[in-house]
Design a protein with these regions (language model features):
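RecB-family 4Fe-4S metal-dependent nuclease core
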Residues: 1-158
């Protein structure tokens, strides 16, 4: 625990209400709802949310490698903070890779959040279509050459 103390102390020193393992969800109409609501469309749990008037901080602790950080997770948590805490206009977010002492930062404002939500809705619509039709179009990536078990894929071995 001593190894992580400096990171934890710096977060603890940020002013505001601290919410640990904070659960958030929104409906398809982007209205905030209970995490377990049957009407939820998307939900997530933020490791730490700090609310300080019109500003918020969102932190997600990681123990793995920082080689491929997923900033999308930060964006989604920030968007849900804007819905659950309408007074918040700016979110500073971070993936904190504890073991590697690396921090990936991002900042979001509530201005233009409709465009970010539209992007998420498009991504979900693609997934919904794949689930509904059991169609999963192949997409080449770095695993195709040596790691993909689907040998009949057009990209296998690329």
């Amino acid at each position: 625990m001593v190894h992580f103390q400096p990171q934890l102390d710096s977060l603890n020193n940020i002013e505001g209400a601290k919410l640990c393992e904070h659960k958030m969800a929104v409906t398809p109409d982007l209205e905030p709802c209970d995490f377990d609501s049957d009407s939820r469309w998307v939900r997530g749990i933020a490791d730490l949310v700090i609310i300080n008037k019109s500003k918020a901080f969102v932190v997600d602790y990681k123990t793995g490698s920082a080689k491929y950080p997923d900033r999308g997770q930060l964006e989604l948590m920030a968007l849900m903070v804007f819905k659950h805490f309408p007074e918040v206009k700016r979110v500073k977010a971070a993936l904190v890779f504890m073991v590697h002492n690396k921090v990936i930062k991002a900042e979001y404002t509530s201005v233009g959040d409709d465009l970010m939500w539209d992007s998420w809705k498009s991504r979900v619509a693609l997934l919904d279509g794949s689930f509904d039709n059991d169609q999963w179009p192949p997409k080449p990536n770095g695993l195709c050459r040596n790691w993909c078990p689907v040998e009949h894929c057009e990209y296998h071995g690329d």
